[in-house]
Regions:
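Divalent metal-dependent catalytic cores for phosphoryl transfer on phosphate-bearing substrates
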Residues: 83-231
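Glycine- and acidic
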Residues: 50-58, 173-178
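Boundary/junction segments of secreted and surface-exposed precursor proteins
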Residues: 17-23
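Short alpha-helical hairpin
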Residues: 33-50
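Alpha-helical phosphate/pyrophosphate-handling elements in metalloenzyme active cores
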Residues: 55-92, 105
Length: 231
């Protein structure tokens, strides 16, 4: 059925992932847009059935969460506005919803890229005040001043924070929580950078493989994904 993809790993019985009817009707008018959406969902399937590396206690809400956000977006768009949107507009919005939490799934390679590698000085003009290196330094200084109560709330410990050794392959659970909280705070920015390819090694896969999304499309997807965490 057009607009339906099966995610048997998570749901176990081949239950479909449903694109809201308003969106499905629109993208069904353009075979390329429909193909792009379905291929993106297939490319990212594994992310919705695995716990992120830096969130050991993360609750897997997978495609259910994506469906809820898609439905919220669909309900927020008035019918008159919907009539003005093209199939491509809707396909980019769907892609942004799929990508919006991807910053939470950054791997060690991705973290090292933004904090130790060539991504550490990156910032997007007009959107970022600080580079990743500056954001990380500011974050560490902040959490090292936390009260015992705050340390317990965020990290489950009441002792002073020690900066994680990002070069280590044996990060402790506390190290992962510290890194994970940093990713959580900036996951909207990360989603944007993943979409535009600033972090090509951070996801261990090409999420746009087999699609015809252009560079401009990916920028728009990234900005839309980023917007859910912008003031």
């Amino acid at each position: 059925t057009a607009g339906v993809v099966y995610w048997e790993k998570e749901r176990g019985m081949g239950m479909p992932v449903i694109i809201p009817e308003k969106f499905k009707k629109k993208i069904n008018k353009d075979s390329e847009c429909l193909a792009n959406v379905l291929r993106l969902i297939q490319n990212t399937e594994s992310l919705f059935v695995e716990r992120p590396e830096f969130f050991p206690d993360y609750t897997i809400h997978g495609i259910t969460h994506i469906e809820k956000v898609l439905n919220y977006a669909s309900n927020l768009i008035a019918e008159q506005t919907m009539k003005k949107l093209t199939a491509k507009d809707v396909s980019l919005l769907i892609a942004a919803v799929i990508l919006h939490d991807f910053g939470m799934f950054l791997t060690k390679a991705g973290v090292r890229k933004i904090l130790l590698g060539d991504g550490r000085t990156h910032r997007t003009e007009h959107l970022d005040k600080c580079s990743w290196e500056e954001e990380w330094d500011a974050y560490l200084k902040q959490i090292k001043r936390y009260s015992e109560e705050k340390l317990m709330y965020y990290f489950g410990i009441g002792t002073m924070i020690i900066s994680p050794d990002l070069t280590s392959n044996n990060l402790s659970d506390i190290d992962k929580l510290i890194i994970g909280e940093f990713l959580r705070r900036h996951h909207h920015r990360l989603a944007h950078e993943i979409a535009i390819g600033v972090l090509p090694g951070g996801m261990d896969q090409d999420i746009f493989a087999g699609t015809s999304f252009t560079k401009a499309d990916k920028e728009e997807i990234g900005i839309l994904a980023r917007s859910h965490g912008m003031p």
